[in-house]
Design a protein with these regions (language model features):
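Compositionally biased terminal segments of proteins
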Residues: 1-166
Length: 166
């Protein structure tokens, strides 16, 4: 029988399969919904003998998974996740209507009603107002001037657009 915690009370976050130790990822199934295919080859900077087609999570799945795991993350990891969500929204801002369709047509129906409530609640809890996690995210982005208010506004507006009903 598997437990979320080890005998010493610490979270059990790894699993051994043969000689490989891997980190357990929560809500991994969300990352597998409508993955995007990209080709890695010499032409785009990968020193491969043959091109390799890779599947990567679509941006909607990526942000939803970050919202689902937020409460279980350490504070420093939460700040990194906030910055990842911010950067993903900025990078794909022109595609938010298409990303919303992925959410409404594929991701949301695959989640339990409790998970859907967690997503919407986490978006409001994390980005409803500037907080210490958002301030820490701004500090992490030290090489570029990011204001906590700007992070909060971008994430709140972007997630509102992503999660609003079709």
């Amino acid at each position: 029988m598997s437990s979320e915690y080890r005998r010493n009370g610490k979270p059990d976050v790894t699993e051994r399969v043969g000689d490989v130790v891997a980190q357990k990822l929560r809500h991994l199934e969300v990352l597998l919904v409508q993955p995007w295919s990209v080709t890695a080859n010499r032409g785009n900077g990968f020193d491969l003998a043959e091109p390799a087609v890779l599947q990567i999570p679509n941006p909607s799945s990526y942000m939803i998974q970050k919202l689902l795991i937020h409460d279980r993350r350490k504070p420093a990891e939460r700040a990194k996740d906030v910055l990842y969500i911010h950067d993903t929204i900025e990078l794909f801002s022109d595609s938010l209507p298409a990303l919303r369709r992925i959410w409404t047509d594929s991701i949301s129906p695959a989640l339990s009603s409790a998970a859907r409530r967690t997503v919407s609640g986490a978006a409001e809890e994390i980005f409803g107002a500037v907080n210490d996690t958002i301030r820490e995210a701004a500090l992490i982005a030290a090489t570029r001037p990011l204001d906590p208010i700007r992070i909060q506004e971008v994430c709140s507006a972007g997630l509102d657009e992503l999660l609003r009903p079709a």
